[in-house]
């Protein structure tokens, strides 16, 4: 999913940010193409999810995996609502930067 997602955080008075690039893993190309129509809703939901996270939690591997699972569930929810099926198996973080 391009462009990469960027979220800003304020931690202990310091500005921090997260940048994450995502790939959707699915088996049916036609379903993935159909899901692209709903990309604005998917991106909005993911931005809201990412910006609502605790920065300190994201700095741990467990926190990153939990976020990946929540992001996967968010996209699957939109797919189920709009297309009547889950469509994607997983979202994969292909790049994850915290600063």
Where are these predicted regions, by residue range?
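Flexible, low-complexity charged segments
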Residues: 1-99
């Amino acid at each position: 999913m391009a462009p990469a997602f960027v979220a800003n955080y304020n931690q202990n008075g310091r500005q921090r940010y997260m940048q994450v690039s995502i790939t959707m893993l699915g088996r049916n190309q036609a379903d993935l193409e159909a899901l692209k129509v709903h990309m604005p809703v998917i991106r909005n939901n993911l931005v809201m999810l990412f910006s609502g996270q605790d920065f300190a939690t994201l700095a741990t591997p467990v926190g990153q995996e939990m976020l990946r699972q929540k992001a996967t569930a968010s996209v699957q929810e939109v797919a189920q609502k709009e297309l009547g099926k889950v469509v994607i198996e997983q979202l994969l973080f292909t790049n994850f930067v915290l600063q």
